[in-house]
């Protein structure tokens, strides 16, 4: 397992509860840029729409050798999870006070994976 990027801010700002491993749908120039380590998870978050999971605001730098077919750096990317996992996350989010944050991006074999965690925000007052 080769770790590409970690979200250390999430460990500081949230109490992390449950961990899920999700595949991520990437374009050709995105995966080439990820292999070079040009990923930032700092301000990214996970959103669930119509029983599909998306990661938003995750920055993958444009590939240096990509021409007009290069990708948009902060586009919305679909995450690949089992239906049971999506339903479990959705039910816990409906209880309130929880969110889902990406904490780590890594390669499992040749596939890029994103570790997402169910989290509760910390109070600083």
Predicted regions and their residues:
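Short solvent-exposed loop/turn micro-motifs enriched in small/polar/acidic residues
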Residues: 17, 38-39, 72, 96-99
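Residue-level signature for short turns and capping positions that connect secondary-structure elements
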Residues: 21, 31, 46, 60-61, ...
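Flexible glycine-/small-residue-rich
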Residues: 28, 48-50, 57, 116-120
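Helix-adjacent hinge/juxtasegments
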Residues: 49-89
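Beta-rich strand-turn-strand
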Residues: 80-117, 121-123
């Amino acid at each position: 397992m080769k770790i590409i990027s970690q979200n250390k801010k999430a460990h500081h700002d949230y109490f992390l509860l449950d961990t899920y491993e999700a595949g991520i749908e990437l374009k050709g120039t995105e995966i080439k840029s990820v292999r070079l380590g040009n990923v930032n998870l700092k301000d990214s978050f996970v959103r669930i729409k119509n029983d599909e999971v998306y990661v938003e605001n995750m920055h993958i730098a444009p590939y240096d050798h990509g021409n007009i077919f290069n990708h948009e750096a902060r586009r919305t990317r679909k995450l690949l999870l089992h239906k049971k996992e999506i339903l479990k996350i959705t039910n816990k989010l409906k209880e309130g006070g929880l969110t889902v944050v990406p904490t780590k991006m890594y390669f499992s074999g040749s596939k890029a994976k994103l570790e997402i965690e169910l989290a509760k925000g910390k109070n600083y007052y």
